UniProtKB/Swiss-Prot annotation:
One of its GO terms (biological process) is SOS response. Residues 1-13 have a biased composition (Polar residues). This is Cell division inhibitor SulA. It comes from Klebsiella pneumoniae subsp. pneumoniae (strain ATCC 700721 / MGH 78578). Is rapidly cleaved and degraded by the Lon protease once DNA damage is repaired. InterPro entries: Cell_div_suppressor_SulA (IPR004596), P-loop_NTPase (IPR027417), SulA_CellDiv_inhibitor (IPR050356), SulA_enterobact (IPR047696). The record marks 169 as: Essential for degradation by Lon protease. PANTHER family: BLR3025 PROTEIN-RELATED, CELL DIVISION INHIBITOR SULA. The keyword Cell division applies. Keywords: Cell cycle, Cell division, DNA damage, Septation, SOS response.
């Protein structure tokens, strides 16, 4: 089973980017969307949990796209974290409404192994479904980084994994 999944991924990676749009009806389990709720006062959790995965994805021939709110990624941090500087792309200063649409378009292309974005609000069911479909079409991973709100408005976040991001400055 591992061999067939690997062969399937290799065939998809060699297909032109436009090819993925024609396969949208095909069931593909290689895509993943995950919301990561983090506390800004605990930076090591993100680095311990997320960096090994990003380092592994950095070995693929595809890019890593970072959709950051306002800050630019530090070149020094990218290199010291063991991420391939030549495969990391960043788009900053997107409004939240454009961030989700940009993430969907990027995931769908198949050009990125992972797309990471920061959002202040939870995804709607429709947004989550659109992101999952795009990730499956492009065989990509998408991570939505969301900071924990004040204690009075935590809601369902209490049972979630809280991961901080100190990845940009």
């Amino acid at each position: 089973m591992f061999t067939s999944a690997h062969a399937n991924r290799s065939a998809q990676a060699s297909a032109p980017a436009g090819h993925y749009a024609h396969r949208s009806g095909e069931q593909n389990t290689n895509g993943l969307i995950s919301e990561i709720v983090y506390r800004e006062d605990q930076p090591m959790m993100t680095q311990l949990l997320l960096l090994p995965l990003l380092q592994q994805l950095g070995q693929q021939s595809r890019w890593q796209l970072w959709l950051t709110p306002q800050q630019k990624l530090s070149r020094e941090w990218v290199q010291s974290a063991g991420l391939p500087l030549s495969k990391v792309m960043q788009i900053s200063q997107l409004s939240p409404s454009h961030t989700i649409d940009s993430m969907i378009r990027a995931l769908r292309t198949g050009n990125y192994s992972v797309v990471i974005c920061w959002l202040a609000e939870e995804l709607t069911a429709d947004e989550h479904e659109r992101l999952v479909n795009a990730a499956q079409v492009g065989s990509a991973m998408g991570f939505i980084m969301r900071p924990v709100r004040n204690q009075g408005t935590l809601g369902r976040q209490l049972s979630g994994l809280k991961i901080h991001s100190n990845l940009y400055h």
